[in-house]
Amino acid sequence: MINKRKLILTSFCTGLSLFSYNRILAQEAVKKTSSGKTLHNISSYRYQKWENHFKSIIDGAILSDTKSKCLHFWIGKNNFYKIYPTSVPLTPELTRTGYTKIIKKVVGPDWRPTESMRKRDPQLPEYMPPGPDNPLGTHALYLSWPNYRIHGTSDTRKIGRQSSSGCIGLYNEHIEEIFNLVKIGTPVRLI
């Protein structure tokens, strides 16, 4: 018969060692390459099958999951697939879901807050030119829904949080990578 104390102690030690191992992995979650590029941890995001959302990925496809705060990107016959952490809308009321597509790509986007955004925050400017303080970051993908975009951000604290007025935000280096791969007409789904 197994001694209850040994069983409890063994279970506790096993759990503690797994916890310690996960802490070590978490500490390694953000690394820098030799060129200084930051590598962000995406291991906590669940894999998605493109077939559950799109008919084809030949010209690319983007799925933004607002619950897990990540963006899935697929392209080509070889099933190129990447997951990126995102910022998502502040509230469900600001979140639009469904299918849309990319209608415009802009490097160095300017920004005009909507009337409702300025109502919520009267201190917002009417217009902001491209630049380091622009909340749209370095690149923007305009969607067929008015005023909705997938864009970069210079405020990296927003990534992984509910922090936008409806758009999906990415680290600037991630939006630049996607920007260079997608085409006008690429399908997008927000869930």
What are these regions (language model features)?
Residues 57, 93, 97-98, 110-191:
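Exported/periplasmic cell-wall-interacting domains
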Residues 13, 68, 106, 147, ...:
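Short, flexible active-site-adjacent loop segments at beta-strand->alpha-helix junctions, enriched
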